[in-house]
Amino acid sequence: MRDFKHFGVKRRFFPDRNYNAIWCNLKTIRLGEGKALELPSGESEFYDVGINTKCNAECPFCYVSATGKGVNYPNICETWKKWMSTFWETKKKEIILTNKPFQIAIGSTGEPTIHPEFCEFLKTVYESGVVPNYTTNGITLALDSDLSEQLLDATRRYVGGVAVSFGNKSLRPYARRAIEKLIECGETKINIHHVISDIKSVDEFIQEWNAYGNLILYHVLLPLMPSGRSTTGIEEGVWEYLEEMIQKNHIENVAFGAHFIKNLRTSKIKTWLYDEESFSKNVILTENKVQITPSSFNLQPIQTIQF
């Protein structure tokens, strides 16, 4: 497993927000006491990044309604470089002081692996001192093609972690093959995204957790939301069953989507909680324009940076 120690130790410090964070080798430690205030939208610790609205899956539950008729935003590498040039970074002794984001997750508005600039974009983000991660349905990775090999090579060289979605049952053969290839690659952390909607979806998550063991860093649980193409949400009583099964099986390598926060506040499962969108925002990266939105569920821009 490759590490990011060569990125150094980084610190982001906003005393007026009661925020003090140290990052090293893909781990973030937030220091201090009391509650940190929401960070400025243009200086978030972490961003979800949308580089297209195009997708090769068109899942019925997609919360952004991405389709095969969507678009790949052009010149994303140049736009990223221009945006990163607006941040500051300085070294004090052995610590890098910065207001740059520590990491990003690519794929908030479409399937990133089908963007023609994607591999180059991973390199561009990496060379800017920010760790690129991405979410995928697994189709491109799973296929035996030159593009798949190029993507695996770029992932091996530049990426911190890959999240493979298991939400669409018809695509799971692709998702499984993608995970097999990532495991064989051995150079990146692997997560699985599970959409939790009913009792059966919980049972399927437990089954996959048992099957993969410690090969998966985190199983990320996302509640079905009535957004985009989905018209329904998680069924009543499913959270209680999920909570019971996690405790019964002593599952520790699990993470929860932000929309579970209300359940987690009173849950028996011990987790670190912070307000939704307080340290992160979503970005839509188009040609010479960065649009910052509250989240990937709310794509209404709250800040636009034009170059």
Regions found by a protein language model. Give the residues of each.
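Canonical Radical SAM [4Fe-4S] cluster-binding loop centered on the CxxxCxxC motif
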Residues: 38-82, 86
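N-terminal [4Fe-4S]-dependent radical SAM core
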Residues: 1-48, 66, 280
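Core AdoMet radical
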Residues: 46, 65-78, 94-115, 125-143, ...
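Generic structural signal for well-ordered alpha-helices
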Residues: 80-84, 88, 118-122, 148-152, ...
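Active-site cleft segment of glycoside hydrolase catalytic domains centered on the general acid/base Glu
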Residues: 115-116, 232
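Residue-level recognition of short loop/turn positions
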Residues: 58, 109, 286-289
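Radical SAM enzyme [4Fe-4S]-AdoMet core and its adjacent flexible, acidic
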Residues: 70-74, 161-305
